[in-house]
Amino acid sequence: MSDEEHHFESKADAGASKTYPQQAGTIRKNGYIVIKGRPCKVVEVSTSKTGKHGHAKCHFVAIDIFNAKKLEDIVPSSHNCDVPHVNRTDYQLIDISEDGFVSLLTENGNTKDDLRLPTDDTLLNQVKGGFEEGKDLVLSVMSAMGEEQICAVKDIGTKT
């Protein structure tokens, strides 16, 4: 066999699941749930009693963590729901490009250049304003199910 037969395409994704199962009856307010394929934060849970024909049901009201849309779902409490793996990571802001992308410094010293400026006006103004004033900013990035978005900004002082 030649060396060429052993080459394979490496993927950025290690094959880990983007969600994990959790019984509907154990999901609480402020937890996370996948509704209609979107990662959401639960804002309200109500449980109906077991009826004559079936299981107790959980009624979830949740907000999409990326686009803030309200979604609802009703699931039997004994069934499993998908729960997204949600990570929040802080990065230091290095630069803002003219095309609306940010350049961020990761913990290991590399740069991350694939994130757009936030669409939320308040957050956008905080990031742009602070950067123009020469402040050292740390941006919190929320990631779930293959999506990433800037969700918060912290001022850690002025640049020296």
UniProtKB/Swiss-Prot annotation:
Keyword Glycoprotein: no
Signal peptide: none
GO MF: ribosome binding; RNA binding; translation elongation factor activity; translation initiation factor activity
SUPFAM superfamilies in alphabetical order: Nucleic acid-binding proteins, Translation proteins SH3-like domain
Post-translational modification: Lys-52 undergoes hypusination, a unique post-translational modification that consists in the addition of a butylamino group from spermidine to lysine side chain, leading to the formation of the unusual amino acid hypusine. eIF-5As are the only known proteins to undergo this modification, which is essential for their function.
Modified residues (Hypusine): 52
Biased amino acid composition, Basic and acidic residues: 1-12
UniProt GO BP: positive regulation of translational elongation; positive regulation of translational termination; translational elongation
Keywords from the UniProt entry: Hypusine, Initiation factor, Protein biosynthesis
Region (Disordered): 1-21
Lineage top rank: taxon: Eukaryota
Family indicated by similarity: Belongs to the eIF-5A family.
Summary of the function given for this chain in its UniProt record: Translation factor that promotes translation elongation and termination, particularly upon ribosome stalling at specific amino acid sequence contexts. Binds between the exit (E) and peptidyl (P) site of the ribosome and promotes rescue of stalled ribosome: specifically required for efficient translation of polyproline-containing peptides as well as other motifs that stall the ribosome. Acts as a ribosome quality control (RQC) cofactor by joining the RQC complex to facilitate peptidyl transfer during CAT tailing step.
Protein name: Eukaryotic translation initiation factor 5A-4
Source organism of the structure: Solanum lycopersicum (Tomato)
